[in-house]
UniProtKB/Swiss-Prot annotation:
Protein name: Bifunctional purine biosynthesis protein PurH
Disulfide bridge partners, by residue number: none
Gene name of the encoded protein: purH
InterPro entries the UniProt entry points to: AICAR_Tfase_dup_dom_sf, Cytidine_deaminase-like, MGS-like_dom, MGS-like_dom_sf, PurH-like
Lineage: Bacteria, Pseudomonadati, Pseudomonadota, Alphaproteobacteria, Caulobacterales
Recorded metabolic or biological pathway in which this protein acts: Purine metabolism; IMP biosynthesis via de novo pathway; 5-formamido-1-(5-phospho-D-ribosyl)imidazole-4-carboxamide from 5-amino-1-(5-phospho-D-ribosyl)imidazole-4-carboxamide (10-formyl THF route): step 1/1; Purine metabolism; IMP biosynthesis via de novo pathway; IMP from 5-formamido-1-(5-phospho-D-ribosyl)imidazole-4-carboxamide: step 1/1
Length: 529
């Protein structure tokens, strides 16, 4: 490990004399170049960046004029040179550095503005392997890291907003050490995220589900007043190219989203994505990341009213998600009780107008539904590390069911079982869902044993006058004993859907036959913790 040299303290104020600009995103470039030139800053640039500046009539040198080397190898080598990196890394007030710079004709570079080749965008648009590789920037990250390391003297900018701060600082005579430190921190965060994106792409391209090293990179979207509880700090970061959901949503009205709002809204929207809008309107109401009512209907308003009927008490202060464009009629029903968030792919203008009277209600539109079968990873932090798993993309169809009882289900019972199991996939384990005709009637969530979940779900239905006779009962994991199934049958369920796979399956099947139930095994467990 290199020892830390005894360098002189960095100056608080640096009046820049030279800037190197090399950008792929040229937003605001010419205006910035004009301001720098007017401030007496010499401009050095490369390729297309230089051409854009020169075309505007602003004096600019080519980096080759400094290095004495032309760009070569299709532009792969242009700034990887001691004159460039010496100009970025040289400690101006260290005598030996100053001598080396003088001996080798190296001038200091006080401002570096680089934004990197659009690797992430190339991947997002489905670029070929060769295109993605060619859009891996080498010289840019190298310069950024050099400049950021020497932030005692160099202001490094990786985004137009960074450069805007530097230009503003010039009005006061130069960049301060505090600003340069902030810019350096952002620069290293940018190169870290860039390398993480490259690493993730290579792992996927090579079919490596779990590479030896895995990085998670996100962009700060929002800093929150507090986290899950008031004594916890929190922020919201988004991944590159996120799928439709909270991360892509535009907030049309309401207070700032809280940590719990985002967590619950994500759960609601992931659930509602299970329901194809082409099959009709569907609505989910979520509380503490658990569904308290889910339903389909002939209209969106009907779907909402049926979902609300499952547990109107828990729906108070909940999250509502819809799978289709939000309508005025549905919005009018939603504002009748206190709701924290409504999230939809789109919203009619007259629906938005209905919510305007509820200024605290947060209305989000995402621009689309996520693909419930899309690939990707989910993460969970544990002490000292994090767990990674592929997204739960289980989708059960009628043809997947194995009927294990003597009685075969009716077509209506099959539909009810599939609906209940789809909802159960989004209920915290142990989970029991009673449903009939595209409507949840009772949800039992998060209990330590399955019998209690079945009992609580039935109590919920009774509390709100919902008759469970002839309903379907879904369990997200197998019944380890017959007691949970018996509990469901006593509540009124006649059709049971569960994964199967218990060593006591024969005992459970026997109990179902004695009770005259029909039961289907899915062969797929959908735990949720």
């Amino acid at each position: 490990m290199p020892a830390a040299p005894d360098y002189p303290s960095a100056p608080d104020l640096v009046a820049p004399k030279r800037a190197l600009l090399s950008v792929s995103d040229k937003t605001g470039l010419v205006d910035a170049a004009k301001i720098l030139h007017a401030a007496g800053v010499e401009l050095v640039s490369t390729g297309g960046t230089k051409a854009a500046i020169a075309a505007a009539g602003v004096p600019v040198k080519d980096v080759s004029d400094l290095t004495g080397f032309p760009e070569m190898m299709d532009g792969r080598v242009k700034t990887l040179h001691p004159v460039v990196h010496g100009g970025l890394l040289g400690v101006r007030d260290a005598a030996d550095h100053a001598k080396a710079m003088a001996d080798h004709g190296i001038g200091g570079i006080d401002i570096l503005y680089v934004n990197l080749y659009p690797f992430e965008a190339t991947v997002a648009k489905g670029g070929s392997y060769a295109e993605c590789v060619e859009n891996i920037d080498i010289g840019g990250p190298a310069m950024i890291r050099s400049a950021a390391k020497n932030h005692g003297y160099v202001a490094v900018c990786t985004d137009p907003s960074d450069l805007a701060e530097v230009l503003e600082a010039l009005k006061a005579g130069g960049t301060t050490l505090a600003l340069r430190q902030q810019l350096a921190a952002r620069a290293y965060a940018r190169t870290a995220a860039y390398d993480a994106a490259i690493s993730a792409w290579f792992a996927e391209a090579l079919g490596q589900d779990f590479p030896a090293r895995k990085s998670i990179a996100g962009t700060l979207r929002q800093t929150m007043r507090y986290g899950e509880n008031p004594h916890q700090k929190a922020a919201f970061y988004t991944f590159p190219n996120p799928r439709p959901g909270v991360a892509t949503a535009t907030q049309l009205q309401g207070k700032e989203l809280s940590y719990n709002n985002i967590n619950d809204t994500d759960a609601a929207f992931e659930l509602i994505a299970e329901f194809d809008p082409a099959a009709g309107p569907a609505v989910a109401i979520i509380k503490h990341a658990n569904p308290c009512g889910v339903a389909v209907g002939a209209t969106q308003r009907e779907a909402y009213e049926r979902a609300l009927a499952c547990d109107p008490t828990s729906a108070f202060g909940g999250i509502v998600a819809v799978n289709s464009r939000l309508t005025r009629e549905a919005a009018e029903a939603m504002v009748e009780i206190f709701t924290e968030v409504v999230i939809a792919p789109e919203a009619d203008e007259d629906a938005i107008a209905v919510f305007a009277a509820k200024k605290n209600l947060r209305l989000l539109v995402t621009g689309g539904l996520p693909d419930a079968l899309s690939t990707g990873d989910t993460f969970k932090s544990v002490a000292g590390g994090f767990l990674v798993q592929s997204r739960d993309d289980a989708r059960i169809k009628a043809s997947d069911l194995k009927i294990v009882t003597q009685r075969q289900p009716t077509e209506e019972e099959v539909r009810d079982m599939l609906f209940a199991f789809t909802v159960g996939k989004h209920v915290k384990s142990n989970a029991i869902v009673y449903a009939r005709a595209g409507q949840t009637l009772g949800v039992g969530a998060g209990q330590m044993n399955r019998k209690d979940s079945a009992r609580i779900a039935a109590l919920r239905a009774a509390d709100f006058g919902l008759d469970l006779k002839g309903c379907a009962c879904a369990s997200e994991a197998f019944f380890p004993f017959a007691d949970g199934l018996i509990q469901a049958a006593e509540a009124g369920a006649t059709a049971i859907i569960q994964p199967g796979g218990s060593m006591r399956d024969p005992e459970v099947i026997e109990a179902a036959d004695k009770l005259g139930l029909t039961m289907a095994f899915t062969g797929v467990r959908v735990f949720r913790h």
